UniProtKB/Swiss-Prot annotation:
GO molecular function annotation: 2-isopropylmalate synthase activity; acetyl-CoA C-acetyltransferase activity; manganese ion binding
GO terms (BP aspect): L-leucine biosynthetic process
Record flagged with keyword Transferase: yes
Organism: Trichormus variabilis (strain ATCC 29413 / PCC 7937) (Anabaena variabilis)
Main location: cytoplasm
InterPro entries (alphabetical): 2-IPM_HCS-like, 2-isopropylmalate_synth_dimer, AIPM/Hcit_synth_CS, Aldolase_TIM, LeuA/HCS_post-cat, LeuA_allosteric_dom_sf, LeuA_bact_synth, PYR_CT
Record GO cellular component, one term: cytoplasm
Name by which UniProt lists this protein: 2-isopropylmalate synthase
Function of the protein: Catalyzes the condensation of the acetyl group of acetyl-CoA with 3-methyl-2-oxobutanoate (2-ketoisovalerate) to form 3-carboxy-3-hydroxy-4-methylpentanoate (2-isopropylmalate).
Pathway it works in: Amino-acid biosynthesis; L-leucine biosynthesis; L-leucine from 3-methyl-2-oxobutanoate: step 1/4
Binding site for Mn(2+): D17, H208, H210, N244
Family: Belongs to the alpha-IPM synthase/homocitrate synthase family. LeuA type 1 subfamily.
Gene coding for it: leuA
Localisation per UniProt entry: Cytoplasm
Entries under Gene3D superfamilies matching the protein: 1.10.238.260, 3.30.160.270, Aldolase class I
Amino acid sequence: MTTKPERIIIFDTTLRDGEQCPGATLNIDEKLAIAKQLARLGVDIIEAGFAFASPGDFEAVHKIAQTVGTENGPVICSLARARHDDIKAAAEAIKPAAKGRIHTFIATSDIHLQYKLKKTRPEVIAIAEEMVAYAKSFTDDVEFSPEDAGRSDPEFLYQVLERAIAAGATTINIPDTVGYTTPSEFGAIIKGIKENVPNIDQAIISVHGHNDLGLAVANFLEAVKNGARQLECTINGIGERAGNAALEELVMAMHVRRQYFNPFLGRHPDSEEPLTNIDTKQIYKTSRLVSNLTGMLVQPNKAIVGANAFAHESGIHQDGVLKNKLTYEIMDAQLIGLTDNQIVLGKHSGRNAFRTRLKELGFELSETELNKAFVKFKEVADKKKEISDWDLEAIVNDEIQQAPDLFRVELVQVSCGSNARPTATVTLRTPDGEELTDAAIGTGPVDAVYKAINRVVNVPNQLIEFSVQSVTAGIDAIGEVTIRLRYESRVFSGHAANTDIIVASAQAYVNALNRLYASLQTQDKQTEVTA
């Protein structure tokens, strides 16, 4: 990737920067599931993690490199600070990939130099040069980021970039680390780099931005107009603080407004060639997968993938859409993988019909996963007259993409009413196989269930978020529950779906506790090793 592409390179950092969002902790299997889906989506580069950060991160990057980093698959990248041990760990982690990249960085803004690094400008230039060259000794594909470039002195930034490229960097990434710039300012930064870094034609200009002022996507589109050819983004825009630039918004903005962006890439305005390598029909499925596994709900009015993105309440709008969708919709929902073809299954539907419909919806399940999902399908079909595609999606996500199965819900029973004190009895199977039962009184049925579960699990935690969403309409709709709980300074999420919202609430809570419990077990093992 040392030559200027005629299209935009999509660099997905959902598994690295996106996972830094509080509560979005993922285990290795979940990261692998997302990485596989990102490959189907068609991203060019997957930043699989920060290999040096922890043994778990290293293993995740290594496993993704082994499994997803095929010859025809995406480039697998690991982040590394501008330090020898970081870069060495990154190189080792990405080694199994057919195409690997090391992404190293050091801050260049005066505030970071003074307070964080406590280094002078010449020292930072020397470190950048040395560490890029060191990374280059492991792989030809090296990306360099001057952290907080948006607040860096332009002249100093040009010097650092020139030396990094001379040392072997093939991609120069310009991060707006704190989401501080406006579109015109960010565009000017990219333009300045194009005009003032003598060897810039030897590298691809990339951009990375946060959404603190809600301007990340707008900044990136302005950067494209000024010469940026790689965009670093996340699914659903998840990430630290207010999040990152959203992949789905960037891709669809350039797809819908292709005639506007074509000339900036040297194309004829009417060219129909896609500006990215993304299979847009995989966008919605990828969004749902990331939302379910991270526990980060997508707001209903979120552009492109929100529940209301293609909904119309106004009578005038509804009338126009019925006559011609283009009156009030600038894109077809089918472009992102939504479909009006809602084939309905029921309790008499067989395993073959179930398998066939899941394949049509894009789910690729192993035989074991299919069996688990089919058992759940039959349970739901006994309670629900018709099972829609939305229900199938919820069933698969709930059964297949779950937390470690340490504690298991065996029984949930509640008693409540207008003049009764809400009481819950729960039975959990422990990691040792023992069944424990306890009961509790709460302010409501869910509170009572959670108190009873806590009495069994006995791990202190604080529930900080509880939300319920209906998958479909109707009194027999499946309800999806997402919860987040805090243990010390860490946040863990849980997700579950069921036609009984109390059962879904119990399962979601246990899923979050299982993530917490697994994390504590990992900590204990690491403590034993270092002791």
